[in-house]
Amino acid sequence: MTVKIGSLTLNSRVYVPPMAGVTDIVFRSIVRTIDPGCMMSTEMVSSRALLAKPESRLMDLAAGEHPIGIQIFGHEPDVMAHAAQLAEKRGADFIDINMGCPVPKITKGKDGCALMK
């Protein structure tokens, strides 16, 4: 069964969510051996940090690693838009905006689930 999200066609119903400290490029390559067509995202990356260091290894994508999204977090629309453009240039098929992280380190900066307030 295929799933279509915008212009993205998925041949798998499996989505491996972004997990800080887990979904790095090595983990994703292992998952791809099990389900090559599953949808995955990178670990979450600070939008502001991406603007300061656009060559961040957290956005490294392997050749053929599609479909793949890059998850960003932040709360400043202009900064997030620019970070999303950088992620797109790095090869992301979609941008995943983190709006669910409840960790105090993230929410005290008005990011993650604090965006839902």
Q: What feature does the model see in each segment?
A:
Residues 104-117:
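Glycine-rich tight-turn/loop motif centered on a GG-T
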Residues 1-4, 8, 12-13:
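Extreme N-terminal starter segment of soluble prokaryotic enzymes
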Residues 48, 101-105:
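Feature marks short, surface-exposed loop/turn motifs that line or immediately flank catalytic pockets
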Residues 2-4, 19-93:
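Glycine-rich, positively charged N-terminal anion/phosphate-binding segment
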Residues 11, 65-69, 110:
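Short, solvent-exposed beta-strand edge segments and adjacent coil->beta transition regions
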